[in-house]
Amino acid sequence: MTTSSIEPRNSYKRVMLKLGGEMFGGGKVGIDPDVVDNVARQIAEVAKSGAEIAVVIGGGNFFRGAELQQRGMDRARSDYMGMLGTVMNCLALQDFLGQHGVECRVQTAINMAQVAEPYLPLRAERHLEKGRVVIFGAGMGMPYFSTDTTAAQRALEIGCDVLLMAKAVDGVYSADPRTNPDAELFTEITPKEVIEKSLKVADATAFSLCMDNNMPILVFNLLTDGNIARAVNGERIGTLVQS
């Protein structure tokens, strides 16, 4: 359903921000420092306002396991390569957050003691309570699970109020807005309607996790400066998926 209401949504205290790795590359292989710095600045502004922010980043700017599998590579091995790509993105974001005066911890699902903490949900919650940003790397630590699913699972385990899905479009549309000028933007929609309309919000496993556990999903455009703060503060941007 769409809505014309201008009433603000609830603001959120603890959020999970899911970032696509492709965004970190600026459309290329590797890391675009200008993009990462811009994202870090936006996250830092929100963290300094008192919100608690956890982050999951994809690794698509380095490797995409499913695509490598299509070229004949073993799926599990290619997924592990993708997990390593996510860690590189995590370390880059950690560094830029530090430049903006925000303490940050990286936790990985694969043991990398020299560069990150292991994933420990209770420790992650303590970091958040102390005002630190926590970035989760290496996906779930197992092949066949996407970083969308990681974001949903981590959000549930550490008690986030909402899963913020940062995209390169304004939200969830009735059709692809890049090819259909009549595509309608949904401002609010229920999980049931998402399924009935065959809309793409997150991968099926991540969406099911959120739907089954009543975790709201807010899909919004990361490319609009200040949108992370707007999403956290409850301004009416993007598409809110909730029952």
Curated annotation (Swiss-Prot):
It is found in: Cytoplasm. Its EC number is 2.7.4.22. Belongs to the UMP kinase family. One of its GO terms (cellular component) is cytoplasm. Catalyzes the reversible phosphorylation of UMP to UDP. Homohexamer. Signal peptide: none annotated. GO terms for biological process: 'de novo' CTP biosynthetic process; UDP biosynthetic process. One of its GO terms (molecular function) is ATP binding. This is Uridylate kinase. ATP binds at K18, L19, G20, G21, G60, R64, Y173, D176. It comes from Corynebacterium efficiens (strain DSM 44549 / YS-314 / AJ 12310 / JCM 11189 / NBRC 100395). The keyword ATP-binding applies. UMP binds at G59, D79, M140, G141, M142, P143, Y144, F145, S146, T147. Pathway: Pyrimidine metabolism; CTP biosynthesis via de novo pathway; UDP from UMP (UMPK route): step 1/1. Coiled coil: none annotated. The keyword Transferase applies. Keywords: ATP-binding, Cytoplasm, Kinase, Nucleotide-binding, Pyrimidine biosynthesis, Transferase. InterPro entries: AceGlu_kinase-like_sf (IPR036393), Asp/Glu/Uridylate_kinase (IPR001048), Uridylate_kinase (IPR011817), Uridylate_kinase_bac (IPR015963). Inhibited by UTP. It catalyses: UMP + ATP = UDP + ADP.
